Amino acid sequence: MTFIEEFIYKGYLNQCTDLARLSAITQEAKIAAYIGFDCTATSLHIGSLMQIMILRLLQKHGHTPIVIIGGGTSKIGDPAGKDVTRKALTQEDIKRNAEGIKKSLSKFIKFGKDQGDAIILDNAEWLDSLNYLDFLRDFGSYFSVNRMLTMDSVKLRLDRSHHLSFLELNYMLLQSYDFYYLSKNYNCILQLGGSDQWGNIVIGADLIRKISGKEVFGMTTPLLTTASGAKMGKTAAGAVWLNEDLLSPYDYYQYWRNCEDADVMRFAKLYSELDIVELNKFESLVSEDINAAKKQLAYELTKLCHGERLAKLALETAVKIFEQGDIDENLHTFILAPEILQSGISAYNLFYNANLARSKSEARKIIRGKGAKINDQLVEDENMTIDTNFLRNRKVIKLSVGKKRHILVKV
């Protein structure tokens, strides 16, 4: 399959400025294409995984992926997809977040200076030195305010009478300038992004066409939700982060292992690197044994993010817990000060402190609803005292909420 054929087959396509022309060009020559990530957190989460897989797909087909870390644009904040103004980030926040995002991306993308290697850039390199008056003089006349106000990212805020600052309105100008800069200096002809980026991408393509007459393209991916309508990347317990310092490989594995039945085949197409033959076999497995398919999906995606060794460890840990009823030391752990356990702590307090409940009242509710276990034994009394007598021979206490959330308490 060609790059565009595989892009469509995997379910990545939402809109394209000229799909037929882009398909022809990518078959005739190798191109450079870019995706940007703003520095809003210390790690990317699975909400960005489709964009990351597209970067891998570009690399697979011999094209050059360019990753833009938004060290400059993060100082403003993209209004796209937001009802309220984003909280301003400090320079220290942006720098720390940029390093974390580079770590996330390096798990999936090969960066370097060899042919086919991805390029990573920080738009602060050119935006920080941009003179405002010069920018207005040289580029201001190319932007239509009338058109900017019709873009969904702006129009939705205005229609709801929500605040939209002049600062945020400038974001699409700077993103457009990014595309222009990459087109001029890296011969980049394609910008990719989520569906909420369509307006920004089109304005950038128009800017390049007006200034240089160069043919460039924009392509967006669909907004993804789970089969039940939940937003990708978020769970009741928090975001599904790609960096292991924020989410353990075991918990990452468990997220995919516990996905809805209706999502299994779709996720395999979107997020795995199984080829067509393997996907056809996997589709048969989904029909025959959904749990076996979920285990394979979770293993494949964890291997891609965390490597084969940690993926196998996560799989083995899950088998021991769910199929053999054993305690495994590789479970996520919570360290409790020895003096607390020596003097005793109430059951609901322990579950709350171990982050198995968002509040003490929720911990009480879980126990009252018979959803909590200690060392695989149902907790009947929320106020029961947990002390050193509950430590098992490996000096741990196993806490469980429902069938799928487990943690080891160590002292």
Swiss-Prot record:
GO molecular function terms listed in the Swiss-Prot or TrEMBL record: ATP binding; RNA binding; tyrosine-tRNA ligase activity
Q: At which positions is L-tyrosine bound?
A: 34, 171, 175
Q: Which domain of life is it from?
A: Bacteria
Protein biosynthesis keyword on record: yes
- Gene Ontology annotations of biological process type: tyrosyl-tRNA aminoacylation
- Residues that bind ATP: 234
| Motif position, 'HIGH' region | 39-48
Q: Where in or outside the cell? A: Cytoplasm
**Pfam families given in the database record:** tRNA-synt_1b (PF00579)
What's the main place this protein lives? cytoplasm
Record domain S4 RNA-binding: where: 345-411
Entry's PROSITE patterns? S4
Keywords assigned? Aminoacyl-tRNA synthetase, ATP-binding, Cytoplasm, Ligase, Nucleotide-binding, Protein biosynthesis, RNA-binding
Which reaction equation describes what this protein catalyses?
tRNA(Tyr) + L-tyrosine + ATP = L-tyrosyl-tRNA(Tyr) + AMP + diphosphate + H(+)
| Claim: Plastid is one of the keywords in the record | no
Which Enzyme Commission numbers does its entry carry? Answer: 6.1.1.1
Q: What does this protein do?
A: Catalyzes the attachment of tyrosine to tRNA(Tyr) in a two-step reaction: tyrosine is first activated by ATP to form Tyr-AMP and then transferred to the acceptor end of tRNA(Tyr).
Family, according to the entry, reads as follows: Belongs to the class-I aminoacyl-tRNA synthetase family. TyrS type 1 subfamily.
Name used for this protein in its record: Tyrosine--tRNA ligase
* Organism annotation: Rickettsia prowazekii (strain Madrid E)
Q: Which gene encodes it?
A: tyrS
